[in-house]
């Protein structure tokens, strides 16, 4: 599933998780460590999204539950607090319930789904997720066209209606060159359904259709979404997310990307570096065979700090963590971290 970040919900974490993050920061002063992990369970998907390169790949042998647990333990030792699952379509996995159950015992756990199977699988997963994102890129036929399957919109909405009372839920919407006029409709739908919505900006992968928006048209869409956020509509993105994109892409004030705050693991258990946008999920180092902290603190991240090629929230939002802006911290992270972020975390 392209341009989806399953760990976007860092603003919605409990204070208990916040204390865990603080303990990790204190345990690893002046060290780089991944706070967030994203794991593609498989590439296989029941939809064929235009902007996604991953459903076009053949899955090799997938990790079994013992290997999934081994991966989780490696991530936990490295300081990861959030684990998000994506695909492909995660709900196609027959063992998805057990995988999520094992994850929630160790992490704040989230998942991204296209929603087609959500209603049918709800009982299997509802007690093992802290948050879930359902992809919606337009209203009705617009969504179906982008997703490559008639009925996608209807199934996604039915999934949202079934799950929203059991799992904290948000719509995840990718802004492309074919749906910039859908932003208001998607926000209106989120309000109607009683859920939040997170927006991503499509990035052009080498093996997918070129769907990134034209920059000047995109500017107006971002300004519109920023105004909705300021007006108090249920948008997950921080105000700083929108202002950072505007300042970098249309001004001369790039944000400093910190891709090392997020670690991505492919369906075979390989680490993806420096990020899955530039790497496109081509890993070759097993996570359980790697000293992640040693790798993270010897890898040269400097060339990627000024990248600014994508605006994926799983990279941009964490990169804002040490901004000296208490209101942003209270909105996007945790009250328990305010005192730390007011200072310099030396990240």
Give the positions of each predicted feature.
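Radical SAM/AdoMet-radical enzyme domain recognition
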Residues: 65-86, 92-204
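Generic structural signal for small/hydrophobic residues in well-ordered secondary structure
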Residues: 41, 45-46, 103, 134, ...
């Amino acid at each position: 599933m392209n341009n989806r970040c399953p760990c976007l919900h860092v603003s919605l974490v409990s204070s208990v998780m916040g204390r865990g993050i603080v303990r990790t920061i204190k345990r690893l002063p002046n060290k780089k460590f991944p706070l967030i992990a994203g794991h593609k369970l498989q590439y296989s998907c029941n939809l064929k999204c235009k902007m996604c390169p991953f459903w076009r790949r053949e899955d090799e042998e997938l990790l079994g539950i013992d290997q999934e647990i081994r991966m989780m333990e490696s991530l936990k030792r490295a300081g990861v607090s959030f684990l998000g699952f994506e695909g492909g379509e995660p709900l196609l996995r027959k063992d998805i319930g057990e995988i999520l159950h094992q994850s929630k015992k160790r992490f704040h756990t989230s998942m991204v789904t296209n929603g087609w199977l959500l209603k049918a699988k709800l009982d299997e997963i509802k007690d093992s997720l802290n948050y879930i994102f359902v992809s919606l890129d337009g209203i009705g036929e617009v969504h179906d066209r982008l997703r490559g399957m008639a009925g996608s919109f209807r199934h996604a909405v039915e999934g949202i209606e079934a799950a929203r009372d059991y799992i904290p839920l948000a719509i995840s919407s990718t802004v492309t060159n074919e749906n910039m006029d859908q932003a208001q409709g998607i926000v209106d739908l989120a309000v109607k359904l009683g859920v939040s919505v997170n927006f991503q900006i499509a990035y052009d992968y080498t093996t997918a259709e070129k769907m990134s928006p034209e920059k000047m048209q995109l500017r107006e869409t971002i300004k519109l979404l920023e105004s909705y956020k300021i007006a108090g509509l249920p948008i997950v993105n921080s105000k700083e997310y929108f202002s950072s994109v505007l300042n970098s892409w249309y001004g001369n004030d790039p944000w400093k990307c910190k891709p090392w705050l997020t670690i991505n693991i492919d369906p075979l258990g390989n680490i993806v570096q420096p990020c899955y946008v530039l790497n496109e999920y081509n890993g070759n180092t097993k996570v359980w065979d790697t000293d992640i902290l040693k790798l993270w603190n010897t890898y040269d991240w400097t060339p990627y700090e000024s990248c600014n090629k994508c605006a994926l929230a799983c990279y941009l939002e964490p990169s804002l963590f040490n901004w000296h802006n208490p209101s942003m911290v209270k909105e996007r992270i945790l009250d328990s971290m305010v005192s730390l972020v007011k200072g310099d975390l030396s990240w």
